UniProtKB/Swiss-Prot annotation:
One of its GO terms (cellular component) is COP9 signalosome. It is found in: Cytoplasm; Nucleus. One of its GO terms (biological process) is protein stabilization. Component of the CSN complex, probably composed of CSN1b, alien/CSN2, CSN3, CSN4, CSN5, CSN6, CSN7 and CSN8. Interacts directly with CSN7. Belongs to the CSN4 family. GO terms for molecular function: transcription cis-regulatory region binding. Pfam families: CSN4_RPN5_eIF3a, PCI, PSMD12-CSN4_N. This is COP9 signalosome complex subunit 4. Keywords: Cytoplasm, Developmental protein, Differentiation, Nucleus, Oogenesis, Signalosome. Transmembrane segments: none annotated. SMART domains: PINT. Residues 204-373 form the PCI domain. Its main location: cytoplasm.
Amino acid sequence: MAANYGISTAALRSQLMGLINFTGTHKDQADKYRQLLKTVLTNTGQELIDGLRLFVEAIVNEHVSLVISRQILNDVGSELSKLPDDLSKMLSHFTLEKVNPRVISFEEQVAGIRFHLANIYERNQQWRDAATVLVGIPLETGQKQYSVECKLGTYLKIARLYLEDNDSVQAELFINRASLLQAETNSEELQVLYKVCYARVLDYRRKFIEAAQRYNELSYRKIVDQGERMTALKKALICTVLASAGQQRSRMLATLFKDERCQHLPAYGILEKMYLERIIRRSELQEFEALLQDHQKAATSDGSSILDRAVFEHNLLSASKLYNNITFEELGALLDIPAVKAEKIASQMITEGRMNGHIDQISAIVHFENRELLPQWDRQIQSLCYQVNSIIEKISVAEPDWMDNLN
């Protein structure tokens, strides 16, 4: 054996055959396999590939004791992680293929190789391939017992990888598996990661108000970096704006409007107009649109973008506070959409209980039901108080001495 100069395929095959019939102790036999593996790794190019393939085939052979083959396959897994990605990926797949007939005997070793393969795919942004490799690990059904933290972390990673591949359906499947485990761990880091993934799944699935609530919760978690907390708050604001108009969104708008941190976000202007129930024009949405992710720019069933649909509904609710009734034509002009579309949106919101009113088809008029005035006045007074407080705070910063004299 020439440890410093590699080994030929013929010589390797001969030595492997000799080791099968080795009569010494398991420890001595394992040491000889390790020395032979070390020699194979000194090869280069095709000789390295051929040598490792031959070595793997030999050690997973049923004639080699499991005590030995498991140890040496662990060593092979460690060495695979040191090779260049392309070479390591090819040899990892080869190893998994050869082990497959006896996979139950090598669960731990196979899992290690799969985790390694997933990291390679992830580094190369091959998200779906990385997820698929991890899905192949029998976390619940295998003989090996995995810790709650390992299973939870793996499910969350699979969900995140599917999200990166824009497959929210598969991501939700693994988030649901993770949800059964997240209460069993004391790891705050994993719990936060679960909440992040869950919020993203809700976001991708267009369950915007639920996503906004989760993002808003994350924005208060001390374990999360300050910059990440502000990112979560921004996402909460974006999802709230994109959500369907109704009581849930109104409550979320109020929560965010009262959060002083939101005043520093680029989308604050839209938040303010929505909370104060003001009409929003299409020209005012350009800055907000630039904040949207690709999945948030998708079209709805009527061809409108998600944002346009949300703004149409908001403007319709705002109009219901200004008018007792309005014709389809006037409503369409107010919302800057065709009258037929305006009628359809109004009809849907009334049917779903998100707006009070009724439609007179014969007269082509939407009638808005009278609201109690006191709650409206309360909101308007509350809004005015917030704005006055904001002005006072700005004066205090700019002219503290003048404010002291007033006191």
